Swiss-Prot record:
The modification Phosphotyrosine is found at Y620, Y633. Residues 762-782 are annotated as: Fusion loop. This is Envelopment polyprotein. Residues 612-653 are annotated as: Inhibition of interferon induction. Glycans are attached at N137, N352, N404, N932. The gene is GP. The lineage of its organism: Viruses, Riboviria, Orthornavirae, Negarnaviricota, Polyploviricotina. Residues 1-19 form the signal peptide. Residues 521-538, 593-610, 597-608, 616-630, 1126-1141 are annotated as: Binding to the ribonucleoprotein. Residues 20-489, 654-1109 are lumenal.
Length: 1141
């Protein structure tokens, strides 16, 4: 019966992957590989293997890197297992003397028995180490395959295969977006264990990393510090033990890649920390694999045995069990200097360093360590797109890596490339009718697809007229403009080149239609009038003479003659229309009328008696004799059309943007007579800047004007914070440990070394219903129920907002007086003449809120209104926290229940929550408020950022006192001279341009003003600059203009002497711009572009064409002359005109 119990427990090892034989071993690599000596590590859990097949297991490789052959060699192990004593009766009750252990020597290959200097020289010799470890019970073993490779293999290898038994392991090298760090909490973390000594705490971060350690035996030598067990005994303050002679050390790798850390090494903080954790958890801090989170084991009891089997006395001891294996079953004895390797399926060997004898050390140890370090700084992405088929091919790249990329309009497929430190991600956008929006590294990028379509139009037009590519390209640049402006350009060119042919042709078609329309209207009018007369006659007859219906056939008559004919013919059975005989009944007569062909005889006679309507011949003659072929008429219409089309062209080139942003205006700025106080009251989005510029005029003297410039920068949020620590996620484990004799304190259980655990013991069974049949009965034994959290990992940083402040920098230039101040809500900038106040802010943040960041700060975070800080329960937000003061574990509010069945092993049930707070949050992520940030700056106690989404708003009030000293302030000695340095970008409303201006300020020390980018007609962009005496460089970003625009740097109505022409808007690839950079509100009161401005713009465009590609002008003039010749041939002068002449 006991064997049946063991078999049932073995079924708990059913693995989800047992039905497939291809598993994945992932190796995470930074995407920039330097000349360091680091090692990358990856591991994979394999399905269980029957115990009988373990000795034949061999780790094979098809990878292209060099492998160390040392681990593939056969290694002698002592197999130490347990069994029921042979002299035990079949129905005997289990006791401490019921079972015994046995030992034998076996040869195993591929286990993690790593010789000296293998890992130490792996990076230098470019050799990789592969091995596997075993966790076994009495029936099966759980293999774990490890791969440790020089970090340079990240460059040479992408994928390969390993084989162990029937299983195939796909080794996948995956490059992260980290330049050189490890990916933890979505951040790229570089552990620097010495930084805590030399730097203040707010300059570095602390993260929790996994640690994989492998024991390396080193026999010989005189260095007693390598007697590792002595180091453990010192830590637990154990004395009086006979010296354990084993020499060796652990070689540890931190996280996914690091240099090798040697344990023990007292001069290394990391080594000391790992040694301390090994002392606390001698078998490891990773207790279970994921599929075995809820499982049971039965403790058989404590056994001793011999290793090697030839020993005369017992040299090893441990706890025998049946059920799910927990820790490694491979270890090494510490008593002798010669290494003795132990394989103990179904036995947890003694690892308590407080004991003196029969101790072992595991060959592999997995745990966690908290280390200080730096988080790599991220850079913004550059995104560009090219037109491809019906959609667009886009690519995003960043100098330091892309940690987050998404798009609501594109399919981001994560196909990525690395070029040095730069990471590139390619994706496809299926639609180009809308602008492409991409969120990359926390920044919103917008790619204007209108420019892509322009480029495709230019390419198509140039391809069609490929015989003259230069001319075709120049014409395409002018024609391929979207909207009314483009159609106006097309109509202008058609009118100029072919107007003398199109005008008479269209006139002829219009005249023909008018003639047809006139005739149809006349014909319709005649018939309708006749019918109207008939109806009126009928109505009058009915009023005077009575009914117009025949009494015999009941037919309605329209005239008196028709009624008289009915009265004479119908009573005699004769048709009144054709006079043919028929029956004198209503039905017969009505049937005859349907086939009679003369029923309209009386109407026709009446119509003939009326005079026929003749249309007036003058209308036809005027339309027919119109001289649409006259050169005078054609030339007049041609000139009028050109003029009107030029006006439409100029007017359509002006794009009025109703949303906050730049509006194209003419030169100069607005003038306000200061009759009363000037007051502005407005609401400004948090990410927007505001510029207001006017000239304040003295109402009493119009010659006295004071330049006034008001500048408000975007909002900065200042939060005083408290760092609560790192939120952790973990696997919930529920374990049942049962033994049928002794008290519950007789044995130690696995969860008792876990960070967070809860245990309840059901001691001494009082009934037969909860005992397996081989147990001794009631009054003894123990069922220990435990829950613990395993595989803890950091998922995010948590900050609590203690106080909030919203600030904006405000600058005022009034004449020569300049004042700047950073104001916050309910604060003001006050001068003798001006008062600026932030009255309030509409915000979604409140003091007491908790901010959670699941990655870099630039990725944004989540707002929690309720965050647990004390007495947290498992499943609450903030349930598991790693703080500077240590781990904070949650309370488990549930209760245990022991499930019993007669003659079976009892099991534990837990009725509380089994889902961590982090996993609950991910399942309901959309229910939490989120926010984005840009330009973050964080210290120990403060966090500052800018809201890029304009989700917050400030209420601003500005008052300028009318009692200004115009006599003093109107005299402005500041002299501004401008010149153009360079220009980048394209004209038009697509990608825009960047104009670099050189601005010289003289006669005063500083001056706050705005510099515009304008052509001769209007302005397209502005930049506020605080000029200082001497030369200043100002960058002005604008959008608009046309092919003839020469963009100049302008201040008020003064512009640079020369201008520069921007490129055509058809770049091969269009680069996205930052949405936040365009969120500006500019108001200088300059007049809108009027009729004079339109003609000026049109003239500049025509001059631009004339001064550009002269071949284009020549082709247009040639087409014009050709159309004149065709006009002369098709529309010659009239012959009679020639004779009269």
């Amino acid at each position: 019966m006991f064997c049946l119990c063991l078999s049932l427990l073995g079924l708990l090892l059913c693995w989800p992957a047992a039905t497939r034989n291809l598993l994945e071993l992932k190796v995470e690599c930074p995407h920039t590989i330097g000349l360091g000596q680091g090692i990358v590590i990856g591991s994979a859990e394999l399905p269980p293997v029957p115990l009988a097949k373990v000795e034949s297991l061999k780790l094979e490789s098809s990878c292209n890197f060099d492998l160390h052959t040392s681990t593939a060699a056969q290694q002698a192990f002592t197999k130490w297992s347990w069994e029921k004593k042979a002299d035990t009766a079949e129905n005997a009750k289990a006791a401490s003397t019921t079972f015994q252990s046995s030992s034998k020597e076996v040869q195993l290959r591929g286990l993690c028995v790593i010789p000296t200097l293998v890992l130490e020289t792996a990076s230098r010799t470019r050799k990789t180490v592969t091995c596997f470890d075993l966790s076994c019970n009495q029936t099966v073993c759980q293999p774990t395959v490890y791969l440790m490779a020089p970090i340079q293999t990240c460059v040479t290898t992408k994928s390969c295969l390993l084989g162990l038994g029937d299983q195939r392991i796909q080794v996948v090298y995956e490059k992260t977006y980290c330049v050189s760090g490890q990916l933890i909490e979505g951040n790229c973390f570089n552990p620097l264990h010495t930084i805590a000594i030399s730097q203040p705490t707010h300059t570095y971060d602390i993260m929790t990393l996994a640690v994989h350690c492998f024991f390396i035996s080193k026999k010989g030598g005189t260095d007693d510090t390598l007697k590792i067990e002595k180091q453990f005994e010192t830590l637990v303050e154990k004395t009086g033990c006979t010296e354990n002679a084993l020499k060796g050390y652990y070689a540890c790798i931190l996280g996914t890649s690091s240099e090798v850390v040697y344990v023990p090494a007292m001069d290394d903080y990391r080594s000391s920390e790992i040694l301390s954790r090994m002392t606390t958890a001698p078998h490891g801090e990773d207790h279970d694999i994921d599929p075995n989170a809820i499982s049971s084991l039965r403790i058989v009891g404590q056994l001793t045995g011999k290793a090697p089997s030839t020993e005369s006395s017992d040299t090893v001891q441990g706890i025998a069990f049946a059920g799910t294996p927990l820790y490694t079953s491979t270890s090494i004895l510490v008593r002798k200097e010669d290494p003795i390797y132990l394989w103990s399926p179904g036995i947890i060997p003694e690892g308590n360093h407080s004991q003196c004898d029969k101790k072992t050390l595991p060959l592999t140890w997995t745990g966690f360590i908290t280390l200080p370090g730096e988080i790599e700084k991220t850079t913004q992405c550059t995104v560009f797109c090219t037109l491809s088929g019906p959609g667009a091919d886009c690519e995003a790249y960043s100098d330091t890596g892309i940690f987050n990329i998404s798009s609501p309009t594109c399919l981001v497929n994560r196909v990525q490339r690395f070029r040095g430190a730069e990471q590139q991600v390619k994706f496809v956008c299926q639609r180009v009718d809308l602008d492409i929006t991409v969120y990359c590294n926390g920044v919103k990028k917008v790619i204007l697809t209108k420019t892509l379509v322009i480029g495709q139009c230019i390419y198509t037009f140039t391809s069609i007229f490929s015989l003259m590519p230069g001319v075709a390209h120049s014409l395409a640049v002018e024609l391929c403009v979207p909207g009314l402006h483009g159609w106006a350009t097309i109509s202008l060119l058609i009118t100029f080149c072919f107007g003398w042919l199109a005008i008479p042709l269209l006139s002829m078609i219009i005249i023909r239609f008018l003639l047809i329309f006139t005739y149809l209207c006349s014909k319709y009018s005649t018939d309708s009038k006749f019918k109207l007369i008939i109806e009126k006659v009928k109505q009058e007859y009915q009023k005077t003479m009575g009914s117009m219906v025949c009494e015999v056939c009941q037919q309605g008559c329209e005239t008196a003659k028709e009624l008289e004919s009915h009265k004479k013919s119908c009573p005699h059975g004769q048709c009144p229309y054709c006079l043919n005989p028929t029956e004198a009944t209503e039905s017969a007569l009505q049937a005859h009328f349907k086939v009679c062909k003369l029923t309209t005889r009386f109407q026709e006679n009446l119509k003939k008696s009326l005079s026929t309507y003749e249309p007036k011949r003058g209308l036809y003659r005027t339309l027919s004799m119109f001289r649409y072929k006259s050169k005078c008429y054609v030339g007049l219409v041609w000139c009028i059309l050109l003029t009107m089309e030029l006006i439409v062209w100029a007017a359509s080139a002006e794009t009025i943007n109703l949303e906050p942003g730049w509006t194209d205006t003419a030169h100069g700025s607005g003038i306000i007579p200061l009759k009363t106080d000037l007051e502005l009251d407005f609401s400004l989005p948090s990410s927007a800047t505001y510029t207001y510029r006017r000239e304040l005029q003295n109402p009493a003297n119009e010659q006295e004007k004071i330049p006034f410039h008001f500048q408000m920068e975007r909002q900065v949020i200042h939060a005083e914070i408290q760092h609560l620590g790192h939120w952790m996620d973990g696997t919930f484990n529920l374990k049942t440990a049962f033994h049928c004799y002794g008290s519950c304190i007789k044995y130690a259980y696995p969860w008792q070394t876990a960070k967070c655990f809860l245990e309840k013991d059901f001691e001494f069974e009082t009934g037969w219903g909860c005992n397996p049949p081989d147990c001794p009965g009631v009054g003894t034994g123990c069922t220990a129920c435990g829950v613990y959290l395993d595989k803890l990992r950091s998922v995010g940083k948590v900050y609590k907002i203690l106080s909030l402040k919203y600030t904006r920098k405000v600058c005022i230039q009034l004449g020569t007086e300049q004042t700047c101040k950073t104001i916050d809500s309910n604060d003001c900038l006050v001068t003798t003449s001006v008062k600026v106040c932030m009255i309030g802010t509409i915000s979604k943040f409140q003091p007491g809120d908790t901010l959670l960041f699941l990655g870099p700060l630039e990725e944004g975070g989540m707002i929690f209104k309720q965050w647990c800080t004390t007495t947290c329960q498992f499943g609450d937000p903030g349930d598991i926290m790693s703080t500077p003061l240590g781990m904070k574990c949650p309370e488990h509010a549930g209760s245990f229940r022991k499930k019993c069945s007669f003659a079976t092993l009892p099991s534990c049930q837990y009725d509380g929550n089994t889902v961590s707070g982090y996993q609950r949050m991910i399942a309901t992520k959309d229910s939490f408020q989120s926010f984005n940030i840009t330009e973050p700056h964080i210290t120990t106690n403060s966090l500052e950022w800018v809201d890029p989404d304009s989700s917050l708003k400030d209420h601003v009030n500005l008052i300028v006192n009318r009692d200004l000293s115009f006599q003093d302030l109107a005299e402005n000695p500041c002299q501004v001279d401008l010149s153009v340095s360079s220009i980048d970008g394209a004209w038009g409303s697509g990608v825009g341009f960047n104009l670099v201006c050189s601005v010289s300020l003289t006669e005063c020390a500083s001056f706050l003003t705005s510099i515009k980018a304008c052509d001769s007609a209007m302005c397209y962009g502005s930049s506020t600059a605080n000029l200082v005496r001497g030369q200043n460089t100002v960058h002005v970003v604008g959008k608009g203009g046309h092919s003839g625009s020469k963009f100049m740097c302008c201040h008020d109505k003064k512009c640079s002497a020369t201008g520069l022409v921007a490129a055509a808007p058809h770049l091969d690839r269009v680069t996205g711009y930052n949405q936040i950079d365009t969120n500006k509100v500019f108001d200088d009161g300059a007049p809108q572009c009027g009729v004079h401005c339109w003609f000026k713009k049109s003239g500049e465009w025509l001059l631009g064409i004339l001064s550009g590609n002269w071949m284009v002008v020549a082709v247009l003039i040639a087409l014009f002359i050709f159309s004149l010749l065709l006009f002369s041939l098709c529309c010659p002068r009239r012959q009679n005109y020639k004779k009269n002449k």
